[in-house]
């Protein structure tokens, strides 16, 4: 967690924050049913891992912008990180705006929740940057509105996920588990 403060006439003010957004793995998944909307209900054991994207949020006067060096990651409202920032500012309309920078380390389309963890990172960063206006419950509500994995990525750790994957129960940390990830180039 990196925080940059600036001195203003009113004292120190936070201008920018950088944090790690960890990937997740599914240790188990059981499909328990199907909803009318076509989604399946599940029970899963999920785990945050040390592979992380880096998310930086910088205060701006208004609006949302996103930048990511990888050409295949959209830098507009198609990006879930942009959607997360937009949701935050709709929930806190009295706040300003933000420029979000994402450094991708999590492979895209790998099932490791790279986009979801970036969205969760944006919610955490903006809430911290703008003075913790939203409670944990409110942040989880925003996360659930963005996608099932976003709620898990906001909480992290080891979790039992039920429903569509966004009903979470914390589990004890898994002791001494070593994990090797392999991502083929195809």
Regions found by a protein language model. Give the residues of each.
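ATP-dependent small-molecule kinase catalytic core of the GHMP/sugar-kinase superfamily
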Residues: 15-20, 26-44, 132-186
